Amino acid sequence: MGFRIYEIKARQIIDSRGNPTVEADVILEDGSLGRAAVPSGASTGINEAVELRDGDKSVYMGKGVLKAVENIINIISPELEGMSALNQVEIDRKMLALDGTPNKSKLGANAILAVSMATARAAAEYLGLKVYQYLGAYKANILPTPMCNIINGGAHSDNCVDFQEFMIMPIGAKTFNDAIRMSAEVFHTLKGILSKRGYATSVGDEGGFAPNLKSNEEACEVIMEAIKNAGYTPGTDIAIALDPATSELYDPETKKYVLRWSTKEELTSEEMVEYWAKWVEKYPIISIEDGMAEEDWDGWKKLTDKIGDKVQLVGDDLFVTNTSFLKKGIEMKVANAILIKVNQIGTLTETFEAVEMAKKAGYTAIVSHRSGETEDTTIADLVVALGTGQIKTGSLSRTDRIAKYNQLLRIEEELGSIAEYHGRDVFYSIKKQ
């Protein structure tokens, strides 16, 4: 009976931005250990599960997580001890019942998620399986097409670019290994282009460059140049993906989108939709995340009707990995994809439920990191287990991002001849161009 939980430990550690986060150890009766650390976001949806912070301004500027750690040790651990680590659903539902709030504000989503992920890791260790094998069983053989963040703007940097993330997707690669090589080559080529133009090549939270470009358009133009100079064809070998994070630009009082980092221009929902439609015609853009604000459901509907058959439209702040919001989106025919962030919802069980709902509705799903990350690689295993075929985990720099890519390279090697990389074919929610 060594598969039962013997003890749960927790501690406060540091994330990639130097802020505290929660790490948990789940120890089974046979000594099997599962360890997991949770991430945190910079731009967060208003409906996300609550990340419990201590609020003591004299310690870590109020961002300590000792209360969440105490909740694991004093509340969660005593209740889970003796339970089977092999029943992930039962473990997760027990924690949800202990919390008893709709947004996990009592125990903290950071406390609950750390234990949820660590439990899965402990169970995999007990069974002698890799985490992706344990969570995904025989279906776990699809490597994801990566969204590699190469230019940062908005809340992720200190420059004049309004939109948060400009990414590349190696849709023409044959393997994940090739996809990473192609992305790295474009990343290094872009660095040379920026340097020649006199721009800084320092990087933002997610490892992308944060140059003080003259306009939002210039970001796309230098990326196009980098793709070509690296020897690839834009739109065929490598496509562009965007996360403008427009909730950060939206003024709910005036219902306008304010391009506050660049021109100061104010756009209505209709004008924002036309803005994206023009960009999609001008650049090889295959995916736009949070193209409209989370509160602007009417704007989202207009955007989906306008370009939803051509481009993957990803709801992040809109859906916050929550089946209630996703159900609303499906019923309204809003967006055609969901971003999956485990810490937005707080348990692995709820994460699987969200992906299942998305797939049944014909929506694509992208497993994602957060801007505040750790060396934890759970999402790399998770994306293979879920078979979503897409991952968003930053640039080709910073160890907190590279850790996920390296884990996926290992997984592809382990899978050998049964490993699949679908490239452009992962975009089943849009018409093939």
UniProtKB/Swiss-Prot annotation:
Protein family (similarity comment): Belongs to the enolase family.
Compartment list: Cytoplasm; Secreted; Cell surface
Cofactor: Mg(2+)
Protein name in the entry: Enolase
Active site: 206, 341
Keyword Magnesium among record annotations: yes
Highest taxon in the source lineage: Bacteria
Metabolic or biological pathway, per its Swiss-Prot or TrEMBL entry: Carbohydrate degradation; glycolysis; pyruvate from D-glyceraldehyde 3-phosphate: step 4/5
EC number(s) reported in the record: 4.2.1.11
Alphabetized Pfam families for the sequence: Enolase_C, Enolase_N
InterPro entries tied to this protein: Enolase, Enolase-like_C_sf, Enolase-like_N, Enolase_C, Enolase_CS, Enolase_N
Record key words, sorted: Cytoplasm, Glycolysis, Lyase, Magnesium, Metal-binding, Secreted
Any one GO molecular function term: magnesium ion binding
UniProt remark on cofactor binding: Binds a second Mg(2+) ion via substrate during catalysis.
Record-listed Mg(2+) binding positions: 243, 289, 316
SMART domains to which the protein is assigned, alphabetical: Enolase_C, Enolase_N
Reaction catalysis annotation: (2R)-2-phosphoglycerate = phosphoenolpyruvate + H2O
GO CC term (a single one): cell surface
SUPFAM superfamilies: Enolase C-terminal domain-like (SSF51604), Enolase N-terminal domain-like (SSF54826)
